[in-house]
């Protein structure tokens, strides 16, 4: 659960960084 949650945040962070 924690692993998936962290992965989700990292994915969002990478996506946001890529868009920005």
From Swiss-Prot:
Oxidoreductase with an extremely broad substrate specificity that can reduce reversibly 2-oxocarboxylates to (2R)-hydroxycarboxylates. This is 2-oxo-acid reductase. Keywords: 4Fe-4S, Cell membrane, Iron, Iron-sulfur, Membrane, Metal-binding, Molybdenum, Oxidoreductase. Forms various types of homooligomers. Binds 1 [4Fe-4S] cluster per subunit. Binds 1 Mo-molybdopterin (Mo-MPT) cofactor per subunit. Is inhibited by cyanide. Is sensitive to oxygen. It is found in: Cell membrane. One of its GO terms (molecular function) is 2-oxo-acid reductase activity. Belongs to the AOR/FOR family. It catalyses: a (2R)-2-hydroxycarboxylate + A = a 2-oxocarboxylate + AH2. GO terms for cellular component: plasma membrane. Its cofactor is [4Fe-4S] cluster; Mo-molybdopterin. It is an enzyme of class 1 (oxidoreductase). Its main location: membrane. Its EC number is 1.1.99.30. It comes from the Bacteria.
């Amino acid at each position: 659960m924690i692993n998936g949650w962290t992965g989700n945040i990292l994915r969002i962070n990478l996506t946001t960084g890529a868009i920005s």
